[in-house]
Amino acid sequence: MGVASSNTAAGGVVPGENINNDETLSNNNKNNNNNNNNNNNNNNNNNNNSSTTTNLLVAADTAIANMASFYQSTLSDDFKLLASENQLPEDLDTFMETLLFSLNFSEESNHNYVYGLLNELSKQLVSNNLKTKNFNRILMHFINKLNLFNQQLITISESMKKNKGSKQQLILDQSVEIQLYTHQQFLVNYTILIQTFSKYIIENMDHVNIIQQFTGDSENSFKTIPFDLILSILGFLSNELRDCSYDLHDVLLRFILILFSTEMYLPLPTIQENYLTDTFTVDFSFYELLAPKTNIFLNILMDTVYNNPNSPIVYSFIFNLFNNIIENKPPPSTSNSLLDSIGSAASYLLLLPLNAYKYFFPQNNATGNSMTELSTFNLLVLVQYNYPKGNPFRKILSNIQDKDFSIDLLNSNPNNHQIRISMQQLYESIIKSPSSDKNILLLYYLLQENSFFFRYVQSRTDLDNLLLPMIQILYNSFEEKPQQVNMILIIILILSQDSLFNENVHSLIVHQILWYKERLLIDVSLGGILMVVLIKSIILNLSKLRDAHLHTNCLAILANLSSNISHIHPYVANRLVKLLEILSKRYIKLKKMLNQVDSPSKINTNNSNNNVKDNTNNITQSMSSVSISDDLSLDVNQLQQIKNLENHNSSINKHHNESHNNSSFLNSPDLNLKELQSEELTTHSEFLYIVLQIINNTLTYRAYSNPHLIYSLLHQQEYFPVFLNEENLSSLSNNILNILSYFSSELKHAINGLSQQETTAETIMSFIESKSKSLPVPPPDQEGILRFKYEEESTSFEFITPYVWSIIFNYSGEKWDTKNITLFPTVDLTTIKSPSVIDANNFTPKKQLSSDQLHSPPTNTTTTTTTTTNSTSSNTILNSMPIPPPNTQLQQQNNLRNQEQNQEENGDEKDDKIEKEQTTGVELSSTEKTN
């Protein structure tokens, strides 16, 4: 009750009173001069009372310092009543004011003790709530108070808009400011209390008990509490962010994130659960929960927005989230003039809730405390949710317009429900940290859903600021962060669908890349750097991870980039040819081994099961044996090490491998050899087709601007005759061979009369450049240009949902109880001395899958038409295979990393020689001359 009396003495009102703002603003503005005349008298009175105030504050500070030792006694009366078997008094206003303004935690208090105390109170409250309905009553009381404060802010805002242009409209009456400040701090503490109880319920109960706790067991008066709670929070957050409501915005964004966190404590839905027709039947007065394992608050919000797609509250809420992301407004400092005007004692009482707020959400914590981060987390949760009827927030996201695009603004109807933001400011906010997990996911959804943002990104001339940090992640963290790598590849694939992007990245020159360790890259185009890293990723994936999803995405990006390859750097050209060499060796080796397996002499019909297993293991070894070196086989011990790792991981991740074995490279010993042959040969044939198509298109249409690629191919043309007998590869190989034969023949005649000293790399490069310009360029064949387009799969939530919530788990600044989280694996921080955050990129969702269900990244990459001059038409659809269990990948990587690096260094010796010839003028050998 202390705050109520203090507010009255200070000229304010208790939380819950209405404000006649127009009259109050007018009357108090008239009294401004009188208030100014009384300032000196007030200062004198303050000086006279300084001694009393000092004594009061000293006593208060002493009480705070000792508060941790007697929480049970000082706060037990009200809290014990709240959590007991007895019902709360009818006058909740008085009871909650006394309880909430007693919440004060000093900065030195023991956090574990406080959280333990609150958890114990939550446990007692929940155990008695079905009988007492105390939690339901304070929820309804909180909703009413929040709605009342929301209405006060709306009234003040409308009043200030009416007085716009007046000199006095910027001056908020001091008594109104005091009341708003008091009411906000009251609701801040109220939110913290409700959030604590709600969080305990969500973390420790199943969906049925959660619904019972929030709606009551039998009383219809509480049935709409979850709906009313979500609607009231959404209504408040739809208001403009102001200094007088900043703290409450902050805690409500955290609170709604807690309510949505039921998704962390439920397994991913099965196909049958995913396509339930009606998850909720919502009415404003009553609703019924139908679905099992339902995310109650997310479904309520989705159903509400789905049934009211043009709700201005929803659009204002989303608009404010984007505004928060763009502006990242810092928390306001407490006004000294405000505290001075109400006296030190009263201001201390008003600061009690603020101290509790700072205790639970300390601003010195580096994670999860900015308004940008909280808004991003909430936005990601909303757009990623797999709502059976279709996520309405993704539709809202797709309709957001660029307010800087004047043409659309002139043609648009201001009465339409539309969101307009600055795409420039949003883009600049994202590229401040383009490689962070939350920004990568936000960028993915914006590029995928919003055409305005997509067009704006394509128009930027500084794409290196966006792409280089992502490319660096692909280079440095390809093995350690598979989820993040997959999202980056998808983002680049979406961007590469536009020819303007491909043209820009190939024309943008990066002068030096310091983080690239293999070579000193100087004056390489951004597109060239991207190609080099993608090729390195493919080679690494072939030798270790063997994940076809990564192959598909990397090759699709390379294919899209190939339509604009120009003045390719020697090192980039060598790496592209190296990729062709490795794929060719794998293809030849695999085909040879499969022919041996298919031979009757290799199969004993009396012992078919054993032979199938042995032969499959041999094929697996042959696939792994083609390393990134020039050698055709690995050491036997190395092959056995790979095999042991696969067997070990298979036993650890049995339920995950059930869904992966059908699509991983030769993981299943029981796989029928005929099916294996068809699958693996087809996959490698498709990969080779793409690489050959890239080379063929470049030589056919842009040979004059890529002499370094021709030079590199002349060193490795022995692989092309191998594919002349392959049905889908023969036309491409034949066309490439014809072009290379032309250069070889012309080169042979040109150097016949030259001495060995005169036959330098510079001479040969000059000759290639001259001859390439004389090659006839056929008319562009649109059907022959490789075009890959990204399409999101219907099961993409299986990949993204755990990813989103693991990021929130790590970076929201919230203390989560890990023992019941089922969406992704966690570490019990209480059992280790130096806890580290859960890696958001290395987890496997805890989901019970049937054998025919796949866990895969959200990719479905297809080519439309892929033909070239002198080649046959072919519509190719790359097989989408799931990502292997991340822990399987990591164990392989940790054991083979050093070995693979040594092999790559040895395998690149020939590339070094070719590149050195191209760049320094070293002479070709006689054998290379004749080729």
UniProtKB/Swiss-Prot annotation:
The keyword Lipoprotein applies. GO terms for cellular component: Golgi apparatus. Residues 839-858, 919-931 have a biased composition (Polar residues). Residues 1-53, 599-618, 839-931 are annotated as: Disordered. GO terms for biological process: Golgi organization. A lipid is attached at residue 2 (N-myristoyl glycine). The keyword Glycoprotein does not apply. Keywords: Lipoprotein, Myristate. Residues 27-49, 601-618, 859-876, 889-901 have a biased composition (Low complexity). Belongs to the dymeclin family. PANTHER family: DYMECLIN. This is Dymeclin. It comes from Dictyostelium discoideum (Social amoeba).
